[in-house]
Amino acid sequence: MLLGASWLCASKAAATAARGEGEDRQGEQQRGAQARTEEDMDESSLLDLLECSVCLERLDTTAKVLPCQHTFCRRCLESIVCSRHELRCPECRILVGCGVDELPANILLVRLLDGIRQRPRTGASPGSSPPARPGPGTFSALAGGAGGATGSPPCSPVFLSAAAGSSTSSLCDVATNRSVPVAKTLSQLPYAKALYSYEGKEPGDLKFNKGDIIILRRKVDENWYHGELQGMHGFLPASYIQCVRPLPQALPQGKALYDFEMKDRDQDKDCLTFTKDEVLTVIRRVDDNWAEGMLGDKIGIFPLLYVELNDSAKQLIEMDKLCPAATTAYNYDALLSSDPSTVASVAPGPTLSSSGAVSAFQRRVDSKKNAKKRHSFTALSVTHKSSQAASHRHSMEISAPVLISSSDPRAAARIGELAHLSCTVPTQDSSSAGPVPTALPRAAAVAGEQGMSPKVQLPLNVYLALYAYKPQKNDELELRKGEMYRVLEKCQDGWFKGASLKTGVSGVFPGNYVTPVSRVPGGGAGLPWNNVLGGSPLAKGMATIMHPGGGSLSSPATAARSALPLTTLQDHMQHPATSLPTGSCLRHSAQPTASQAGDTTIPTATHASAQALDRPTATVSPLRTQTSPSRLPSTGLRPRSVASPQHGQQSPAQMCPRPAIPFTSAASAITPPNVSAANLSGEVGGTPISGLSTPSLINTGFKPDDKKNEKKEKKSGLLKLLAGASTKKKSRSPPSVSPTHDPQSAMDTSLQGAMGPEVSPLTVHGRAGSCPIESEMQGAIGLEPLHRKAGSLDLNFSLSPSRQATLSMASIRPEPKPLPRERYRVVVSYPPQSEAEIELKEGDIVFVHKKHEDGWFKGTLQRNGRTGLFPGSFVESF
């Protein structure tokens, strides 16, 4: 019993002692964990202050300090070099002259992190388990998602992981992990594989062997790249390599070459004004001369001639030019053919004559156009959304009001009127409208005689004014932008008769200044497509520029409305000389109609001595002058084939087919928007200038010789006038050629020979009066475009060889096209003034690709491979 009692007492004492030791150990562990937590919190708070200002990630020992003493992580500096091809401080924009590897580390940062790492940890028991590895959320953002090696020994914590409690990491792990994203970054760069060896033909070319991996830095054009291989930069032909990871697509942007400001800011609020050297984003193409863009928070349209586009913007412009316009224009040109089989083969549907097929085709065109339409105007946001909700959308697209926002609205009504063509146009008997002039052999007829116009009574539709309009006659109604108007009647010439819902005042106003708010769904009643037209729609369709290949170039607003039903065209082809009656709202004009496809004439119309156009019509005819008080109707004139004055009248056998070209806005090709057309018209003295016309066969009281002499006098006077204007504005005068590649330019020589020396082939592209001009400038003749900066844009759109041909003919090396370049030496340093310019240092070698007529060169620096603009007076050839 005594032994048992002693054993029991001993066991109780041992248990009590063990319990005390356990409590002491537990308290020590709790105190150690609390101390570690406080220490980790202090270190985490300290490290939160040590972060990169670009990516907001924590800095480590691989961070680099710039000469301006700003410190950034290595990954951000490498990404800046890859994207910009130069290194500038993100804080103060100071240019760094050395590479990222040559930059020193921040000694203060390294010592601070090293002190944290070497500081002894308190409260860690020898038997405690090693700290866990950092979770996926710790270094994944810094190291690009790559974890460190699992076997590395634990060091002091760098920062606290939210997912793993007391997980820590070490600076040695950071150094290990930082090598992974660098290699990963290099693998994510755009690169290509060499298909052949290239030794280089000129200084500055990059030499490489077959199978080499070349980092692509920049695409010079379709045939040449600028790349890097083993630290060497140079040019390489595109046909010698195969792009594995292509270059990223840049934003479609353009640099302003000139100042663009509108004179009347109230009526031209939709125009995007800018100054020289500003960079704007290109949204879409409006027509052949205008595009929609964005500058800051403002969206508007601007002339393409005023902006130098980059490659992405050029591709966007070409897609907008070819996809919507070429498709519909090609179908329309095919419908002009008299061969029914040709019409059936090109027709978009089997039942083109029905309104359902036309609306389906129109929806396909609209969807293709709206696929790239990322922005729209504020004034059209409500009405445009409501119009897209309709099942049959026959109203005018957004490109129609954009087309006329900053041009003469009377001229734009002729082009935009194609939206009001009827699906079922009844034919009229030409014998009931008086005499019809006899057409020349293979020439177009003209229907413009007087009569009564059938008017369609519309329902009480409410329209929204898109633009302000000031009345020019007593019966016209003033339009204010944003106000509602009720349309009572719609005239054939594009004018509406209605009343203001706000004031109740009634009158006539241009229909292209308003857009319908209350639309009738379906293809049925009360819309502009249900008008009964007395003129031939073929006269309005001839506003496109046809080419021998069968396609045509026209504005999107015109081309989108060119898909006409088969019955309409057949009826009007059977009656090419239908009469045009006039009503109370209709103003009289001359409307040329095409007798058949492939006519040999250029439809023109002339002013008689006491005859002037009073209202804009949907035809291609000269504008009325502002100073003409006459409201007399103009008689129908027969267009004749334009021939050289030395040869007189030609026989039908001598009249070879030529494409028809409109002359509706000849002044738009010679008058830049910043040259005041009002001043020009004031110097003319209000004398209306005749349209582009040749001696007519109609007896108007003038002999051919007298008319020829009068035309010469007007030509010489206008040449002197514009010569003085161009001298004053030479520093701001834009190039008058389209910046996009136009296949029509190859026809200028043949057209010049056929038209004679008196008329120069001024061709325009669908936007009537591309810039705000007066109608006195509309009939400018004999003026060559001012090719001042025609070579300022890179128009080399040659196609690179296909990959199939390259692989099938691997044994044959393609011959690369030579890149035009000349070696120049910089004699005076030049600091860049904008993003498009490059910095020149004395002694640098520059490869000049293009020389602009204003003295600026476009070239590539051999030192860093950057391409841009620079003044030619700072370099010399050697």
UniProtKB/Swiss-Prot annotation:
GO biological process terms held by the UniProt record: positive regulation of JNK cascade; protein autoubiquitination
Annotated spans, Interaction with RAC1: 364-433
InterPro entries: Endophilin_SH3RF (IPR050384), SH3-like_dom_sf (IPR036028), SH3_domain (IPR001452), SH3RF1/SH3RF3_SH3_4 (IPR035816), SH3RF3_RING-HC_Zfn (IPR028502), SH3RF3_SH3_3 (IPR035612), Znf-RING_euk (IPR027370), Znf_RING (IPR001841)
Organism, scientific name: Mus musculus
Region of interest: Disordered: 19-40, 120-145, 574-659, 688-758
Name assigned to this protein: E3 ubiquitin-protein ligase SH3RF3
PROSITE patterns the record matches: SH3 (PS50002), ZF_RING_1 (PS00518), ZF_RING_2 (PS50089)
Catalysed reactions, as listed in the record: S-ubiquitinyl-[E2 ubiquitin-conjugating enzyme]-L-cysteine + [acceptor protein]-L-lysine = [E2 ubiquitin-conjugating enzyme]-L-cysteine + N(6)-ubiquitinyl-[acceptor protein]-L-lysine
Sequence positions bearing Phosphoserine: S395, S792
Gene Ontology molecular function terms on file: ubiquitin protein ligase activity; zinc ion binding
Reported function: Has E3 ubiquitin-protein ligase activity.
Zinc finger map (RING-type): 52-93
The SH3 domain, residue ranges: 187-246, 249-312, 458-519, 819-878
Cross-referenced CDD domains: RING-HC_SH3RF3, SH3_SH3RF3_3, SH3_SH3RF_C
Bias (Basic and acidic residues): 703-716
Quaternary organization: Interacts (via SH3 domain 3) with PAK2. Interacts with RAC1 (GTP-bound form).
UniProt note: domains: The RING finger domain is required for ubiquitin ligase activity and autoubiquitination.
Pathway: Protein modification; protein ubiquitination
Bias (Polar residues): 590-609, 618-633, 643-653, 690-699, 741-752
Encoding gene (name): Sh3rf3
